From Swiss-Prot:
<comment type="similarity">
    <text>Belongs to the ChlB/BchB/BchZ family.</text>
</comment>
<comment type="pathway">
    <text>Porphyrin-containing compound metabolism; chlorophyll biosynthesis (light-independent).</text>
</comment>
<dbReference type="GO" id="GO:0036068">
    <property type="term" value="P:light-independent chlorophyll biosynthetic process"/>
</dbReference>
<dbReference type="GO" id="GO:0005524">
    <property type="term" value="F:ATP binding"/>
</dbReference>
<dbReference type="GO" id="GO:0016636">
    <property type="term" value="F:oxidoreductase activity, acting on the CH-CH group of donors, iron-sulfur protein as acceptor"/>
</dbReference>
<keyword id="KW-0149">Chlorophyll biosynthesis</keyword>
<keyword id="KW-0067">ATP-binding</keyword>
<dbReference type="GO" id="GO:0016730">
    <property type="term" value="F:oxidoreductase activity, acting on iron-sulfur proteins as donors"/>
</dbReference>
<keyword id="KW-0408">Iron</keyword>
<dbReference type="Pfam" id="PF08369">
    <property type="entry name" value="PCP_red"/>
</dbReference>
<dbReference type="InterPro" id="IPR050152">
    <property type="entry name" value="ChlB/BchB/BchZ"/>
</dbReference>
<feature type="binding site">
    <location>
        <position position="36"/>
    </location>
    <ligand>
        <name>[4Fe-4S] cluster</name>
    </ligand>
</feature>
<comment type="function">
    <text>Component of the dark-operative protochlorophyllide reductase (DPOR) that uses Mg-ATP and reduced ferredoxin to reduce ring D of protochlorophyllide (Pchlide) to form chlorophyllide a (Chlide). This reaction is light-independent. The NB-protein (ChlN-ChlB) is the catalytic component of the complex.</text>
</comment>
<feature type="binding site">
    <location>
        <begin position="429"/>
        <end position="430"/>
    </location>
    <ligand>
        <name>substrate</name>
    </ligand>
</feature>
<keyword id="KW-0411">Iron-sulfur</keyword>
<keyword id="KW-0004">4Fe-4S</keyword>
<keyword id="KW-0560">Oxidoreductase</keyword>
Length: 508
């Protein structure tokens, strides 16, 4: 067991609760101690929801430990069924229920006798899966449950929709810009003449899940959520899926061409090449921007990218292919799917890092000293400590990355948003310099030490004065190089002589 003050992916029950609370009229009951029920507050705050989060905690307390949980859990399920009249109640296991070895499946069977709606136990092992894996499994489980139920009752609709149609799978609550991406993907499908059959799980009714096989294909924009469901629908209903994330000009075009291929294989003749060219040349500003002098100023600049598989891979490709930025390190915290990530990014970056240890990532950033970081909320904190600008491109995120305005990452409008984010993340060198020359609020000394270790070196007055003469936008680098040189040579104090020797050593 490892004590962590920062987790990139939360525990399994958070993933299950994200899926349950994304659906319409589905209630989740969490069998957990006080403290595990922070999901309600987190979702209400971050998503700015007007409605209460449909999650109830069945608290494990001393009475439960003494007498067992069955009576309490069953009563809570039946009570909520009567009060809320949900279509489905999902009972969510937690690490506590696993430790207590509660027979939750038996509780569900018992509660189903008295409940009017459906009751389902989320089939996730709390010690084997994290938030993302649990969300993927829970969505698959709910879809499978309702499709099999409809099949038994012979209520499955026969045949496909008259016009080409799509299911968009994987849009959920607390996802990174998910609502904006969903709107952009719907607009993209409309432009292509494709009807949206269902969007799951966000805002979907479980009663409509039986309509999923009517679509011509499934679109899975995020690798972390929805892939298992899409694979199940392909196996059971011969429903093809597209799992190319339409992020960036190149990948959006590739995604549209794949959709074209799938639709044409089903007896229709569509050609989207003119649409792709028109969007790339005239609608999306990203292709034009990448040829402008502004973007050429970024050519060869060093960047570090870190996030979930989908976003980290997509941003790495955009930076390297479309903007000419040098990605020194690309990393992901999705260790369970590391092979896919390596395959996607290895040709676009110097180094690949697969880790969920924020200290390791922080140290790598301090070592590389990139011009900009593209990562999660944690990398933003690291960037602030090292005075390196950071653009947030993946969850986990805080409130400022749940924007009120329209900011998709997918589709052609997404390419514009990403181009803005990238350009605005790089510090323009003269900005710091001018602030120091003419005075301003931003004259703080650059924090230049590594993330994990405090500096053990002293600077004498002359050396400190000389350092302060160095322009702000390179001062951090000069300080780090000098301290590195001093440590290697065994100096405990940095004087002017040491500083000049360090300068000669690095050939500056």
């Amino acid at each position: 067991m490892k004590l962590a003050y920062w987790m990139y992916a939360g525990p399994a029950h958070i993933g299950t609760l994200r899926i349950a609370s994304s659906f319409k009229n589905v209630h989740a009951i969490m069998h957990a101690p006080l403290g595990d029920d922070y999901f309600n507050v987190m979702r209400s705050m971050l998503e700015r929801e007007r409605d209460f989060t449909p999650v109830t905690a069945s608290i494990v307390d001393r009475n439960v430990l003494a007498r067992g949980s069955q009576e309490k859990v069953v009563n809570n399920i039946v009570r909520k069924d009567g009060e809320e009249r949900p279509d489905l109640i999902v009972l969510t296991p937690t690490c506590t229920s696993s430790i207590l070895q509660e027979d939750l499946a038996n509780f569900v069977e018992r509660a189903q006798m008295d409940a009017q709606g459906d009751v389902l136990l989320a089939d996730v092992n709390h010690y084997r899966y994290n938030e993302l894996q649990a969300a993927d499994r829970t969505l698959h489980q709910i879809v499978k449950f309702y499709l099999e139920k409809a099949r038994k009752k012979e209520q499955l609709p026969q045949g496909k929709t008259e016009n080409p149609s799509v299911n968009i799978i994987g849009i959920s609550t607390l996802g990174f810009h998910n609502q904006h991406d969903c709107r952009e993907l719907k607009q993209l499908m409309k432009d292509l003449g494709i009807e949206v059959n269902e969007v799951i799980p966000d805002g979907a009714s479980v009663h409509n899940l039986k309509n999923l096989p009517k679509a011509w294909f499934n679109l899975v924009p995020y690798r972390e959520l929805g892939l298992t469901t899409a694979q199940y629908l392909e196996e059971e209903f011969n429903l093809p899926y597209v799992d190319i994330t339409p992020m960036g000009v190149v990948e959006t075009a590739r995604c549209i061409r794949k959709i074209q291929q799938i639709i044409n294989e089903q007896g229709t003749n569509v050609d989207y090449e003119e649409y792709i060219n028109n969007q790339t040349l005239y609608v999306s500003q990203a292709a034009w921007f990448s040829r402008s002098i502004d973007c050429q100023n970024l050519t060869g600049k060093k960047a570090v990218v870190f996030g979930d598989n989908t976003h980290a891979a997509a941003i790495t490709k955009i930076l390297a292919r479309e903007m000419g930025i040098h990605v020194v390190l690309a990393g992901t915290y999705c260790k369970y799917d590391a092979d896919w990530f390596k395959e996607q990014v290895s040709e676009y970056c110097d180094e690949v890092l697969i880790s969920d240890d924020n200290g390791e990532i922080g140290d790598a950033i301090a070592r590389i000293e990139p011009s900009a970081i593209f990562g999660t909320q944690m990398e933003r904190h690291v960037g602030k400590r090292l005075d390196i600008p950071c653009g947030v491109i993946a969850a986990p995120i805080h409130i400022q990355n749940f924007p009120i305005g329209y900011k998709p990452f997918c589709g052609y409008e997404g390419t514009n948003q990403i181009a803005d984010l990238v350009y605005n993340s790089f510090t323009l060198g003269m900005e710091d310099h001018l602030l120091e020359i003419f005075g301003g609020h931003d004259t703080k000394e650059v924090i230049t030490k590594g993330i994990s270790a405090d500096s053990d070196l002293n600077w004498n007055k002359e050396a400190q004065a000389e350092l302060n003469k160095v322009p702000g936008f390179v001062r951090g680098k000069v300080k780090r190089n000098t301290e590195k040189f001093a440590r290697e040579r065994g100096f405990s104090e940095i004087s002017l002589e040491v500083m000049y020797a360090a300068k000669e050593a690095v050939g500056a």
